[in-house]
């Protein structure tokens, strides 16, 4: 256990961070992770203040780090890696990507896919808060660049403009 993200990166050569802190402190925790040039930050915390997330998104435009979340279950590539709270036992390696704003729908869809013998390359819960770091289009672009992903399942929420942008993409 380390006192700072920077110390963990220096000692363990970490390239990702998962944020599990109360909403009032989560913005600062994300900033701390962004300041260490990690490849990926996953913010599980729900309800990070909107002003904090607006500042985080401004900072994201200045760095090469991808933020998944907040208010998300995380990301998993079955059999390889998991960051977050996704129940790994329901996933099976395969060729279908999944991107969702809802953790519960993610679990249901993955369970249905796996039960039918359809495995997943990666599943990404992008988060349900008003301001998130990775959009549906960002996720679709990542899946498009992945030679192992042959199809993508997308689970949105009612009234979302991000879902409409993804449909146009």
Residue ranges and their predicted role:
Residues 1-169:
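Catalytic-core regions of core metabolic enzymes
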């Amino acid at each position: 256990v380390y006192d700072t993200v920077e110390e963990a990166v220096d000692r363990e050569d970490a390239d990702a961070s998962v944020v599990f802190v109360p909403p009032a402190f989560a913005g600062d925790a994300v900033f701390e992770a962004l300041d260490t040039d990690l490849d990926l930050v996953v913010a599980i915390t729900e309800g990070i203040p909107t002003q904090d997330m607006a500042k985080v998104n401004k900072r994201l435009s200045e760095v090469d780090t991808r933020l998944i979340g907040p208010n998300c279950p995380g990301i998993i590539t079955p059999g390889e890696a998991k960051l977050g709270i996704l129940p790994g036992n329901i996933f099976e390696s395969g060729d279908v990507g999944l991107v969702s704003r809802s953790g519960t729908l993610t679990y249901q869809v993955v369970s249905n896919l796996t039960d039918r013998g359809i495995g997943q390359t990666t599943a990404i819960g992008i988060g349900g808060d008003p301001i998130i770091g990775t959009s549906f289009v960002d996720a679709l672009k990542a899946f498009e660049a992945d030679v192992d992903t042959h199809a993508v399942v997308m689970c949105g929420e009612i009234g979302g403009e991000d879902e409409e942008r993804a449909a146009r993409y």
